[in-house]
């Protein structure tokens, strides 16, 4: 394994360094080839490194940043005032080649805008998309995008997302000839928005995409598709609804419950069922798949949940490691070159793709 250097925006997210710094130490313990650049306020970071041993400290470097982009600031305002912020400095480290990827739990819109500004989209990609890999009931995985980077998406963007998601499923998740579906309100051809129907028509003409049609939201965790494509608004609502239901379900399994006194054998049976079911469904725990990759850029950027705990942020760091090792941006670029002649005409010097 080759050595990797990642830039962490340790000030971003709901909990800042209190979560991100311990998660960084956890990631270093798991990967001896990893070096981390901790971007943020040194006064907030240094005390949290007290438990780090000499070997860990040799693979850590604090990169000072003057400010933090708040989560409630509009992206346009955040970008204008971003100079010296921990998020921007972390992305600049990737741009300059000092880091191979950036991980942040900060403002999603600001991260999207700054990443596009500093790292630039791949040729043929109009706008990057947030993508994650979710577990399903058949113990496999489904790639889902967009999860919030683009609220409004036209058919061109949906087709581009399908191409990128297919590459990620094949190259990173290692699913041969992955099935691709569009999230819709029904399976019938006449259902859905014009953008979805137009994207469906184009996807049917691309030989390298194994397009299977529409999928409804209630089938997200069934394993019927390997890649699910939607606009960012729909994807974000779908993901957070699913996570809320899963967390509630796992919480109920662990709950001892209140009520009248039961016999010892009923209590024993209940505890056995709790442990058995918790193990059975533990793979659905959202903490295990935290970290959405901002796909379609000339560099690797991972967006962690703002409310991520230490374990979840460490998972996001691991997502960045995998994306770099599998050379995801380079593989997407190669696939785009082979796909575009079949259904796209590149305009504006390759900065955007338009359906023809």
UniProtKB/Swiss-Prot annotation:
Lineage start: Bacteria, Pseudomonadati, Pseudomonadota, Gammaproteobacteria, Enterobacterales
UniProt EC number: 2.3.1.274
Subcellular location: Cytoplasm
Keywords: Cytoplasm, Lipid biosynthesis, Lipid metabolism, Phospholipid biosynthesis, Phospholipid metabolism, Transferase
Protein name: Phosphate acyltransferase
Catalytic function, reaction form: a fatty acyl-[ACP] + phosphate = an acyl phosphate + holo-[ACP]
Species in which this protein is naturally found: Escherichia coli (strain 55989 / EAEC)
Stated role: Catalyzes the reversible formation of acyl-phosphate (acyl-PO(4)) from acyl-[acyl-carrier-protein] (acyl-ACP). This enzyme utilizes acyl-ACP as fatty acyl donor, but not acyl-CoA.
UniProt cross-references to PANTHER family, sorted A to Z: FATTY ACID/PHOSPHOLIPID SYNTHESIS PROTEIN PLSX, PHOSPHATE ACYLTRANSFERASE
């Amino acid at each position: 394994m080759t050595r990797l250097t990642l830039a962490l925006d340790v000030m971003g997210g709901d909990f800042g360094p209190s979560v991100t710094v311990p998660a960084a130490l956890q990631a270093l313990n798991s990967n001896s080839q990893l070096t981390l650049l901790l971007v943020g306020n040194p006064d907030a970071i240094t005390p949290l490194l007290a438990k780090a041993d000499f070997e860990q400290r040799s693979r850590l470097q604090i990169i000072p940043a003057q400010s933090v982009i708040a989560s409630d600031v509009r992206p346009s305002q955040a970008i204008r005032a971003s100079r010296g912020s921990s998020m921007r400095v972390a992305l600049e480290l990737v741009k300059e080649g000092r880091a191979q990827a950036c991980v942040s739990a900060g403002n999603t819109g600001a991260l999207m805008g700054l990443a596009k500004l500093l790292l630039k989209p791949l040729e043929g990609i109009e706008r990057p998309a947030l993508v994650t890999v979710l577990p399903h009931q058949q113990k496999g995985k489904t790639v889902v995008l967009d999860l919030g980077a683009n609220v409004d998406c036209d058919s061109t963007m949906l087709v581009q997302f399908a191409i990128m998601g297919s590459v990620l499923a094949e190259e990173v998740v290692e699913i041969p000839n992955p099935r691709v579906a569009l999230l819709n309100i029904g399976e019938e051809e006449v259902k859905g928005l014009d953008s979805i129907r137009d994207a469906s028509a184009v996807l049917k003409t691309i030989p390298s995409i194994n397009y299977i049609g529409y999928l409804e939201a209630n089938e997200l965790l069934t394993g019927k598709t390997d890649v699910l494509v939607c606009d960012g608004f729909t994807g974000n609502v779908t993901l957070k609804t699913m996570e809320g239901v899963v967390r509630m379900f796992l919480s109920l399994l662990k709950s001892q419950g209140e009520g009248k006194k039961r016999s010892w054998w009923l209590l024993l049976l209940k505890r056995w069922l709790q442990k058995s079911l918790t193990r059975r469904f533990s793979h659905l725990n959202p903490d295990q798949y935290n970290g959405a990759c901002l796909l379609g850029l000339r560099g690797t950027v991972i967006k962690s949940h703002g409310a991520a705990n230490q374990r979840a942020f460490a998972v996001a760091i691991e997502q960045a490691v995998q994306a770099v090792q599998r050379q995801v941006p380079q593989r997407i670029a190669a696939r785009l070159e082979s796909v575009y002649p079949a259904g796209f005409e590149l305009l504006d010097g390759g900065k955007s793709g338009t359906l023809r």
